[in-house]
Design a protein with these regions (language model features):
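Intrinsically disordered, low-complexity regulatory regions enriched in serine/threonine/proline
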Residues: 1-19, 27-118
Length: 118
C-alpha cells in the first residue's frame, strides 16, 4: 500500500509546482540519503523540495552551482509570509496534500521575492 501511494504523491508535487517550469525552471528529480528531491533550477536560484521520511521541506539555493553561495530554508527567505508554527507542524506531517498545497501557494505567490532574496 505504501509503495502504491508514493507515485501519486510524486505526481501531485510535480503538478503543484509546475508553475516553476512555466517560469523557465528545469526540473531534476533524484534520491539523496533516503530523501526524494525535486530540484527546480534557473539562472537566479535553485528551489529544492525535499519529500523525506521525516516530512517535507523547501530549501532555496543561490549561486552558480554546487557548492552554492547561499542556501536558506524557505522560512528564512520569507519570514513575514510564513507562520513558523504552522509550517513546523505541517512539515512534520509527512507531506500530506495540505502541506504540499501550503508550500506551493507560498512559493507561487512570492516567487519574485524568492528569486531576488540575496
Amino acid at each position: 500500500m505504501f509503495f502504491q501511494k508514493k507515485p501519486k504523491k510524486r505526481r501531485y508535487i510535480k503538478q503543484k509546482f509546475h508553475f516553476l517550469i512555466d517560469r523557465g525552471y528545469k526540473l531534476k528529480y533524484y534520491h539523496r540519503n533516503g530523501e526524494e528531491l525535486f530540484s527546480y533550477s534557473s539562472k537566479t536560484c535553485n528551489i529544492e523540495i525535499f519529500n523525506e521520511p521525516q516530512g517535507f521541506d523547501v530549501v532555496i539555493n543561490y549561486g552558480d552551482g554546487f557548492p552554492y553561495d547561499y542556501s536558506h530554508n524557505i522560512r528564512k527567505v520569507l519570514p513575514s509570509k510564513i507562520n513558523t508554527e504552522i509550517a513546523d507542524k505541517k512539515i512534520k506531517l509527512f507531506a500530506p496534500v495540505s502541506t504540499i498545497d501550503y508550500f506551493a501557494t507560498i512559493v507561487s505567490q512570492n516567487i519574485e521575492e524568492i528569486e531576488h532574496f540575496h
